[in-house]
């Protein structure tokens, strides 16, 4: 293709969390977009990706807040392939000036926006559409013995999850 392939990288309020807007080239057939190019990402992502994951979730499913301990702490590049989510990252780096602060942003297949969550953050999302397929690249392989989580409704964090309908005793479905 003769057009430039570009990405816009926008730091969010926790500036280590980066919203990535890929250029979409549209025509009467649909669109074409790069979703990753190592040379474009190297300023923002200093580690190679070693594993790709895909999660399919129904409406209202809340996944997270997950993280993995060192030496296998994971950075994640999150992209929605179908549907919409509201994505959250929580700074869990004890030495960070933003320790225990969180940021949330919508991601959807329609916009193609992606989110970079570096190692040292817990990550989670809630599905805000009829369902969602979420793909993410990670910088360390999954190690179940190092897997940890934080409650989605931790009273100290006060995460403002979007209201997605009435919550039954079993809801949201958390994983």
Where are these regions (language model features)?
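Non-catalytic, conserved peripheral segments adjacent to functional cores
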Residues: 3-113, 129-131, 138-175
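A short local structural element in Rossmann-fold oxidoreductases
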Residues: 126
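Recognition helices and adjacent regulatory flanks at domain boundaries
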Residues: 121-123
């Amino acid at each position: 293709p003769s057009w430039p392939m570009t990405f816009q990288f926008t730091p969010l309020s926790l500036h280590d969390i980066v919203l990535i807007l890929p250029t979409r080239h549209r025509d009467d057939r649909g669109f074409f977009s790069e979703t990753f190019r190592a040379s474009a990402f190297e300023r923002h992502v200093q580690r190679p990706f070693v594993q790709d994951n895909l999660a399919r979730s129904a409406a209202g499913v809340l996944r997270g807040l997950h993280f993995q301990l060192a030496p296998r702490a994971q950075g994640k590049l999150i992209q929605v392939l179908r549907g919409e989510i509201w994505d959250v990252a929580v700074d869990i780096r004890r030495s960070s000036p933003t320790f225990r602060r969180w940021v949330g942003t919508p991601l959807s297949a329609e916009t193609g926006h992606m989110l970079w969550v570096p190692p040292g953050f817990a990550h989670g999302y809630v599905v805000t559409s009829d369902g969602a397929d979420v793909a993410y690249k990670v910088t360390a392989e999954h190690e179940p013995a190092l897997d940890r989580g934080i409650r989605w409704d931790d009273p100290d964090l006060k995460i403002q999850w979007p209201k997605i309908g009435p919550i039954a005793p079993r809801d949201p479905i958390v994983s």
